[in-house]
Amino acid sequence: MDFLRLYLPGLHQALRGALDSLGTFVSYLLGDAVPTVEREAQAAEELGVVAVGKTGKIVEEEAQEDLEGLRGSQNEGAGRLRGPGDDRRHEVGSSAVEQTWGWGDGSSHGSQAERQDSGAGETAKAARCQEPSAHLEARKKSKAGSGACQDRSGQAQERQESHEQEVNREERLRSWEQEEEEEEVRAREPGMARGAESEWTWHGETEGKAGAVGPKAAGDNREMEQGVREADAGETEEPGAEGAGKGEEVVVVEKACESTRAWGTWGPGAEPEDWGILGREEARTTPGREEARAILDGEEARTISGGEEAETASGGEEAETASGGEEAGTASGGEEAGIASGGEAGTASGGEEAGTASGGEEAGTASGGDEAWTTSGKEEADLLGVRQTEYGAVPGERLLEATGKVWVLEEEGDEEREAEVSPFPKQPQVLGTERTEEAAESQTAGREAVGGQEAGESFEGQVDLRGKEAEMRQDLGIRADRARMEELVQAEEAQEERGSSRDPVAELPSDGEAEGTADLEATPEARPEEELTGEESEAAQTSCGLLGVEWGGLTHSVTKGQGPELMGGAQTPTKQPEEREAGEVELMGVLALSKEEQERSLEAGPRHAGSVKPEASEAFPGAWENRTRKDMERGNTQEDAADGEQREEEETAGGQTLAAEAEGDRESELSEVPEAGGEGLTTQDAGCGTEEGEASVSENQELDGSTGADAGPCPSLGEAYARETEDEEAEADRTSRRGWRLQAVAVGLPDREDAQTGSVAAGIMGGDVVPHISAAGAGEALEGVLGQGWDSKEKEEAAAGEHAGGQEFGLEGSAEEEVTGRGSQVEAFESREGGPWGGRVEAEESAGAEDSCGLDPAGSQTARAEGMGAMVEAGGLLEKWTLLEEEAVGWQEREQREDSEGRCGDYHPEGEAPRLLDAEGLMVTGGRRAEAKETEPESLEHVRGQEEQPTHQAPAEAAPESVGEAETAEAMGSARGGAANSWSEAPLPGSLLDVSVPRSRVHLSRSSSQRRSRPSFRRTPAWEQQEEPPAPNPPEEELSAPEQRPLQLEEPLEPSPLRHDGTPVPARRRPLGHGFGLAHPGMMQELQARLGRPKPQ
């Protein structure tokens, strides 16, 4: 449906334009499975344009008749949801709420609600100030339409039904329209200019998307619009209410509604589909539908700001719209956050205004309310979507909506957050954000919002920008989610950009120490996010858009989530839904953890710790405790540094963060996805902890290198090498990760589920094993991604642990550049073993153990072994499990053993080998991967076993297998001294070459022999044929080692034809039972011999 919506907008507009005068026909067509939301939006555009002149009013009325009919059914279906709002705007509100609730009830209602939005948009345009209820209604419609966007895809039938209902509702809508006109007159008295102004300002300013706080500068219609567009995303209604119900606001609302509907609307309701769909529709339909909706929202906001209906429409309808319009939009979410914050659920009108006041605070809080509000609103919208994603893609909004208590649920969550979030001035923002975020991540996003406000108010301007950029990225990410290959390209581009953004982002990771925590903990999410990415990552990304500035790492993780979704999503779109759901839960818990840590770092944690901890505990009890300890330690140390660094670096790296976010999104999340439990957490766990974690999360590893270097004893070397390496790695990572992502995501997704459990657990459990598990989870493909992440981490950790020092960074950097994957990993691993090992192990196991199940290295190792065990179990390699257990014995031993056991596991052959097995060598790095792919899993295991031995002998060998990793390992060896010597000593595993080559030869010979033997055995007598066909089959199908052996045997047999009977014929016959075996010069003779032989016998 997304593509249909993408492509149907023209059809929708054309149909809608034709149907403008045919309300029933409109409802009929809108009832079609064709995405009606776009039609509605387009019709809303057309009808709205017509409606601008009261001439369109007739059409509007017709459309409203349809909408009313729709509402009639929606009133029925959505009546339960409508209850709150019906009371408030019972006449118009009922239908509008019905629409809102209706589309909550069904996408048919939603789409029709959107059609209603069209009609309502038209009506609202014509009767822009007629009735704020109508505006809210239309706005709800628009938002409902947004929700409908996602619903309608699945509920086209319901749409058809609701078309009929829509007819009734449109009839009602006419009455409402009239009432709205009356109220519009009343509203126009203060805001008549709003009516006309809002109509075309609405249109003209639809273009002024970005803007200041909009509603605050109500006079600055376009500025407001721009700001409100975003602010309206969260504040549309509030800004409208604040904006004194001005047409400007309407304009703002329009654009804000675009963003709101794109963000707020589909954040809450349209979330999964609608984010992408609404993003597209927004782009497509934004002019019409979003305009109509924005107008409706704007009118609502205007009227609300007008204050006549501001309390009533805003309070009653908006609370309703908050209930349905929270869904209806982040504006509702924002207002609702404000409402829930100010009036919580009960004071919907007062709370709307309170929310507007809160929203004013929010809007006024540094535009912090507005920006943070916008961001929060977007976060809300996105996080509502995320929440809905939590509940199931749409369910968050739908669930709330179905509950008829969207705003109530959000309020409740927000109330919790309110309890959690002490600052109410911010809390309106936080609550609005949190409310939606609560929906999305219940408490986690709220903490983000709070932490975001704490750290983010400083950055809220940036947060707004970043939130907008993040949202824009989300739009792109959502759309790219739809077109994930695009995002893969974007991710690559972002990674390339990341090369340039890395240093700033490295700085961000510094401020992102706490962010790193978020990223690291968001990292477990990252995998789910990679799956959830479009939804939750966007939601988290939006929440991180607000918090993204704050939570550079979190934004990275969120954005990363987006990136992997772009990448991994494109790669594994099927898994994403499942993993997204699971990942959503994990995302909530993990985000809760990460946000919690971040907020702790921001010192907001204590407030939220209680709330976050349950979520985190739910998601990962051990991780929670460990993170709590880790966060306490980090929070103490990094809290101050993170706050200051975050603000400074976020400010400095504001744009860079965005770029890095977009970049780090994809790259980091990929690394994070596999690294989610691994690199991110491990990086966290590793020396620099959050900084590294975020750095790796942000830059994956390059930033980690620099951040780690910053945090590490050798910041200069670390940074220099890390950044040099980052640039190089950026390229290498882009190159490798593009491939690795695709492979690793494809390979790693199934594994990632396992690895996510294992890696999240193991990532929680231990940093080193976690990266290994991550690699295991993601496979070497991810290992390539993680490799540098680990490399960078280890560079960080090397930087953190001066053991690696600048040399390791440089060597690792260059080696990573060369190897980028395994070589760097080997280097990093050697760093672990070597000097860096001490620092890394100490930092990693201390922080890692903290992050991991145990604070003690043994605990982290045990956790690692356990997590790896899960990974190994997933891999089905108990050997590696044993090695994982042995891993606790010693990293070098583990390394070697793992190397021996997991041929792919330069770092953790353990986890990787299982992944390799899982991927059947897909994850096998470089030649191994191709080789493993060529080689069957069996032979892969053989090869692996054989390779593992050489790998055991020399991870550097494994690295050389990967290509130049031997050089890397050797370079590392020279850098690290004898550390790499043992690795590079052993030659490349000849067994691999032997195994693989014989296999290929066997295949060739088999195919030829079979080809020749088939006609032969066909000629052969039935009994011989019977004997022979099995042999041909095994060569063809089994390609079994026995076949290879017989081939080898037979070939030797050819030289000695006398071998059997001493007679050439028997020699030709050789073993009749073998079939013809390999094609050989004597095949014909052998065949003839066999044919002639059986006759005597």
Swiss-Prot record:
Compositionally biased region (Basic residues): 1000-1017
Please cite one Gene Ontology biological process associated with this protein.
lipid transport
Q: What induces it?
A: Suppressed significantly by PPARA and PPARG in THP-1 and blood-borne monocyte-macrophages. Decreased after pitavastatin treatment in peripheral blood macrophages and remnant lipoprotein (RLP)-induced foam cell formation.
In which compartments does the protein localize? Answer: Cell membrane
Location, primary (coarse class): membrane
Q: Membrane topology type, per the record? A: Peripheral membrane protein
Locate the compositionally biased regions of type Low complexity.
Answer: 209-218, 312-330, 1041-1050
Instruction: List where Acidic residues composition bias occurs.
Output: 640-652
Tissue pattern of expression reads: Expressed in peripheral blood leukocytes > bone marrow = spleen > lymph node, and only faintly visible in appendix and thymus. Expressed in the brain, heart, kidney, liver, lung, pancreas, and placenta. Expressed primarily by reticuloendothelial cells: monocytes, macrophages, and endothelial cells. Expressed in atherosclerotic lesion foam cells.
Q: Which residues carry this modification: Phosphoserine?
A: 458, 510, 594
Bias (Basic and acidic residues) occurs at 83-92, 158-177, 185-208, 219-232, 279-302, 463-487, 496-505, 594-606, 626-637, 791-800, 892-918, 928-950
What segments bear the compositional bias annotation Gly residues? 331-362
Per UniProt, the keywords (alphabetical) are: Atherosclerosis, Cell membrane, Cholesterol metabolism, Chylomicron, LDL, Lipid metabolism, Lipid transport, Membrane, Phosphoprotein, Receptor, Steroid metabolism, Sterol metabolism, Transport, VLDL
Q: How is it modified after translation?
A: There are 2 forms in macrophages, the membrane-binding proteins 200 kDa (MBP 200) and 235 kDa (MBP 235), that can be reduced into a single active ligand-binding species with intermediate mobility (MBP 200R).
Q: Indicate where the modification Phosphothreonine is found in the sequence.
A: 572
Q: Which GO terms describe its molecular function?
A: very-low-density lipoprotein particle receptor activity
Q: What this chain does, per the record? A: Macrophage receptor that binds to the apolipoprotein B48 (APOB) of dietary triglyceride (TG)-rich lipoproteins (TRL) or to a like domain of APOB in hypertriglyceridemic very low density lipoprotein (HTG-VLDL). Binds and internalizes TRL when out of the context of the macrophage. May provide essential lipids to reticuloendothelial cells. Could also be involved in foam cell formation with elevated TRL and remnant lipoprotein (RLP). Mediates the rapid high-affinity uptake of chylomicrons (CM), HTG-VLDL, and trypsinized (tryp) VLDL devoid of APOE in vitro in macrophages.
Listed name of the protein: Apolipoprotein B receptor
At the highest ranks, the source species' classification is: Eukaryota, Metazoa, Chordata, Craniata, Vertebrata
